[in-house]
Amino acid sequence: MFLIHASFLVILLGALLSWTTAQSGTIHLRLGEATNVMKTTEGNSVDLGFKVALKTFRMDCYPGTDAAMDYVTEITTSDELLEISMNKIGYYHGFRFMQSGYDSDMQGSILGVYHDPWGIAVTYLGYAMLLISLIAILLGKGTRMRQLYRKATAGNALKVAAVAVVMALSPLFSLNSQAQERININSHVADGFGRVCVLYNSRITPINTVAVDFVTKLCGKPSWDGLSATEVFCGWVFDVPYWETVKMIEIKDKKAQELLGLNDKWASFNDFWDEYNEYKLEKPLKEAMRKGDTKMQKSLRDADEKFNIVRMLYGGEMLKLFPYRQADGKYKWFAPGQSLGNINLDEKELTFVRKSMDYLAESIITGDNSRASEIVKKIYSYQHVKAKDVIPSKFLIYAEVFYNRLNTLRLPTMLYLSLSLLLGVASTIALNQKKRKIASKVTLWLTVIMFLHTSLLLLLRWMVSGHLPMSNGFETMQFMAWATLLLTLFMGKRFMPVKNFGPLLSSFALLVAMITDGNPQITQLMPVLQSPLLSVHVMVIMFSYALFGLMALIAAEGIWAHRRGDLAKEDQLAATSGFLLYPAVSLLAVGIFIGAVWANVSWGRYWSWDSKETWALITMLIYSAPLHSDLKWLHKPLHIHIYMLLAFLCVLMTYFGVNYFLAGLHSYA
């Protein structure tokens, strides 16, 4: 324990040295110009002692798109050429140069400058000491952690408390009979069209992904009236008059329903227009903005967004099908009907780009499915010939389509949650060992199925996006569900509470992912997030959160055991929590300093007292308290259970409170 406390003192000393001796500021360089002065954060000018000049600045984009992948600055000194980009710092004479911004004309670059001769080295020494001490505690013999392990695994298997949850019934809704007959779009034609690629949200993706986003945005689920998302999307593209009459647009706000003249929450696109062919919400929105009526703006925002999503489809924003390689090697994508300008195409190719979608629409409307399939194949082949270096492979296209079909969390999440609750009840009321064993086996199989399911989802999302799926709230909660299941499989045999609570906690994590973020679009990573250190940082932190969540559920079971007078069980559960506390705190500490190293590499500072950093530190300190042997009152079973339950509020604040309510550098998460 001495080394742990010493490491924190060294880390604090490093922070003090950084605060007292470090200098920070910015330099603004224009192409070909040199400077030896940086502007500090206080507005003062500081002589660097050497001159730097901007040689080049460029923005690298993801292949085939205009989405920024990296910003690269090359500067020259008297004797060196430095290349600086996101996650790549330039070093010269003790100064660190970080990419901070650029001029709109791409002829200038703004660099952050940081000079910290002592603080970083001392802080890193503290991190190393902390890591060594944590390893010693986790692997050492005769430690309190070992004693708690023996106590937690002694005796009979532990049961799980029953948890009462009221589940709301999903609303049933019906379709109004439509006066106009729908064109029957062949499912094979729709599926083939769904595998054609488009440029969408600065990413090259199959139309199936656009269709899922489009339909989910309109009606809240990726299907409608027994039709797949791609079939519905094809209807909106090729059978516009009918689909404009379908009441599939969900309007939740009562004020918006009133202005649109609705009797319930379902609207058609035609409901947005009055008898004079004017948009019904245009005047109320303008009036609300003029008066600063934020309440009215909020009421109408969702309905207005859904209206404009359909308008975006009509404007071609969702159907940029045809790639054209420009002279600079970059690609421009054209939608059907869009002006092609002076692009260099022969007459036959130009006709194909302009007319192929018209021919496809004609074939679908007349029911000529073989011709429609042939045209879809030609568009698909055209893309793979004209943009073969940027179009996803056939395997990745099929993988993304499969992911879109598989990634419907509502039904499996509710099923997993219901089963895990029922198994908890069964484990609690089982009166004999045989029934408990049956419940235990079913719990194990449920855990395995959930683990394989979440593993497949994460793997497919990783393959499709090209980066580890831990860049937003939805992905991190999915990863936490997976991490919980992995811990359950790894530790469940020794710790029955972990085995019984694992599927339940994982189900709640999936439920939170479903409720808070729904299913966000897969997007390209912003440049600063393209670091392996970030992936490791998030991964380690989420494993620690999974352990803290398990400990909170175990604490609730321990309090329940105390109320029933089962002191032996209460004591054993306290030992289980105490044992899990060691790896949980260790993972959190390691995750925090990996994040600090990433921040130091990315923008030159390892700590900025951002709200996420501050709350992560508070969480670590609060969970570290029970590890101190001097705090005898925290070693009493009931006290430790109450403490663990309350401490989990810090985890909730660190994750949800900071991500969704507080502003800071971690807002992108």
How should each PLM-predicted stretch be described?
Residues M1-A669:
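Solvent-exposed, non-transmembrane regions of integral membrane proteins
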